From Swiss-Prot:
CDD domains: MFS_OCT_plant. GO terms for biological process: cadaverine transport; leaf senescence; monoatomic ion transport. GO terms for cellular component: plasma membrane. High affinity carnitine transporter involved in the active cellular uptake of carnitine. Also transports organic cations. Regulates lateral root development. Residues 1-35 are annotated as: Disordered. This is Organic cation/carnitine transporter 1. Residues 1-52, 155-172, 219-224, 278-336, 390-394, 456-463, 511-539 are cytoplasmic. GO terms for molecular function: ATP binding; carnitine transmembrane transporter activity. The chain crosses the membrane at residues 53-73, 134-154, 173-193, 196-218, 225-245, 257-277, 337-357, 369-389, 395-415, 435-455, 464-484, 490-510. It comes from Arabidopsis thaliana (Mouse-ear cress). It is found in: Cell membrane. Keywords: ATP-binding, Cell membrane, Developmental protein, Ion transport, Membrane, Nucleotide-binding, Transmembrane, Transmembrane helix, Transport. The gene is OCT1. Its main location: membrane.
Length: 539
């Protein structure tokens, strides 16, 4: 059966000088109803949500909160190295004077000591200074490289064999195993290997969380729901300075504490989450998809019509292998994912780089990280509001520009003679860095939501996972630049600033998706966008 034509936004995948009239989308989609035998009719999942369940109700909010809790552990696992791999303060034994990290290299081992026990961080325990200073960047770099590879594996599993929910469960359990194992590392090389494994296994959390949360809400609320999920990432980030301060004498205990949280979530809370009805439908499990939709409707105080069926998005059922092959053979999809990944590389590089670079500011590490974490809250609020009133493309690009310019200003404020000339330079640098981090956080979060809307259901998790791979590839380069920043903070901020501006420029060639429908298959989306482009060319 062929669905009747839907009204789609008149947008074209070109640089942003082409205006678009979003008011056309506000007229709503024409209801598509397919008459079936026995007086039954079929709707798409989008239509069932909009017409019978509600675009956003108690059920969707509760479900989004439930699956988004896992972002807490993702943040803790990702950013723990800010504290576990930091270089602690040292002092001269003769005078008790504080010694800068670079100055230790000219001293004999008996002339100085770490302030506090050697178990504070991996740097003090294994003496990763001077000729070994770049070794401290290896574990974090391998963590993000592991996340890069893991994202591809989890994306395939979530779109094919396991679905979103089981993949999230698997990722949480394996995150616990590897994080707990890290606390027993005997040397930096075992530590680095286990960080790689930890990054690999935790990489399924983020993509599954955002897809599970957004696939059951109406198109008007997709951006906001995707953004609100990042509140939990912020909570995880904000919890780190407190936990790190309480366990500041043992980086091993810090790892043990954060390791048990994802296990508790996987056992106690995740079983109550629903699998995505869109994924169930694409896999031919129509009855299970209807069961989930009925539960959502019931929680919203509504009931689905007894004669309702779901439109099969794949009349001739393909297996996942053919869907993956079609993804890489579909020209518009490949072009789009390349641009998304290019923007994601710069965004991930800057977002994680600013956080890891906190120790290179002229400020207290715990306070700096806490300020950065607090800036995530206005970033989410502002991003959520702007997603409701602005197009995705300019929102991402402008946020990237702001983050880039803030980093460049931080570079100027890092010059020693500027710090000496301006008495409030340290506070000003912290404020500018916080604004830059807020902007980079907004860009990072918006790009997640943007990617969800750019691709259809049968490859959506794969696309989001590829974006995460780009994020992680960018993030894997950040620790090396942070290590360089210990010698030249100005240089690290300059590189972060340029990368952020470039990622914003790349995004200008992405298609706008605000208020556009979510399609189920590549063929369905390609056909709709082709008709849309032809219409624009005619008009």
């Amino acid at each position: 059966m062929e669905p009747s034509k839907q009204e789609v936004p008149k947008l074209m995948e070109t640089p942003p000088n082409i205006s678009n009239d979003s008011s056309a989308t506000e007229k709503g989609e024409a209801t598509r109803q397919q008459q079936l035998p026995n007086n039954r009719y079929a709707l798409t999942v989008d239509e069932v949500i909009e017409q019978h369940i509600g675009a956003l109700g108690f059920a969707q909010i509760l479900h989004a909160l439930l699956v988004s809790i896992a972002w807490i552990f993702d943040a803790q696992t990702t950013l723990i190295s800010i504290f576990s791999d930091a270089q602690p303060a040292a002092r001269l034994l003769a005078t008790g004077a504080i010694v800068e990290g670079a100055s230790l290299c000219g001293l004999a081992s008996g002339e100085w000591e770490w302030i506090g026990p050697k178990s504070d961080t991996v740097v003090s325990e294994w003496n990763l200074i001077c000729q070994h200073k770049f070794l401290v960047a290896v574990p974090s770099t391998l963590f993000f490289i592991g996340s890069l590879f893991g994202s591809g594996v989890y994306g395939y599993l979530a779109d094919s064999w396991f679905g979103r929910k089981k993949t999230l469960l698997l990722s949480c359990v394996l995150t616990f195993v590897t994080a707990f194992a890290i606390s027993f590392s005997p040397n930096v090389w075992v530590y680095a290997f286990l960080r790689f494994a930890n990054g690999f296994f935790r990489s399924g959390i983020g993509s599954c969380c955002i897809v599970l949360a957004t696939e059951i809400v109406g198109k008007k609320w997709r951006g906001q729901v995707g953004q609100y999920g990042f509140f939990f990432f912020t909570l995880g980030f904000l919890s780190l300075p407190l936990m790190a301060y309480l366990e500041r004498k043992s980086w091993r205990n810090l790892y043990r504490i954060i390791s048990f949280l994802p296990l508790g979530y996987a056992v106690c809370l995740l079983p109550f989450a629903y699998e995505s009805p869109r994924w169930l439908l694409v896999k031919g499990r129509n009855k299970e998809a209807m069961v989930v939709l009925k539960k959502l409707a019931r929680l919203n105080g509504k009931q689905l019509p007894a004669d309702l069926s779901l439109v099969d998005p794949i009349p001739e059922r393909d297996d996942q292998t053919s869907s993956s092959e079609k993804f890489w053979k579909t020209k518009w999809a490949v072009k789009r994912i390349i641009m998304v990944m290019m923007a994601g590389f710069g965004s991930g590089f800057v977002y994680y780089g600013i956080q890891l670079n906190a120790e290179n500011l002229n400020f207290n590490l715990y306070l700096t990280v806490a300020v950065n974490a607090l800036m995530e809250f206005p970033a989410v609020f502002i991003g959520s509001f702007l997603l409701g009133v602005m197009n995705r493309r300019p929102l991402f690009s402008n946020s990237s520009y702001l983050a880039g310019f803030a980093c460049l200003l931080c570079a100027v404020l890092s010059i020693h003679r500027v710090i000496r000339a301006i008495s409030v330079a340290k506070w000003l640098q912290l404020a500018v860095e916080a604004v830059g981090f807020m902007a980079s956080s907004t860009a990072y979060d918006v790009l997640y939501v943007y990617c969800v809307e750019l691709f259809p259901t049968n490859v959506r998790n794969t696309a989001v996972s590829l974006l995460r791979q780009a994020f992680m590839l960018g993030a894997s380069a950040a620790p090396l630049l942070v290590a360089l920043g210990r010698e030249s903070a100005m240089m690290s901020f300059i590189v972060f600033g340029v990368a952020s501006v470039l990622s914003g420029i790349v995004s200008l060639w992405l298609r706008e998706t605000r208020n556009a429908p979510l399609y189920e298959t590549l063929a369905q989306q390609g056909k709709a966008e082709e008709i849309e482009n032809e219409t624009i060319m005619i008009t």
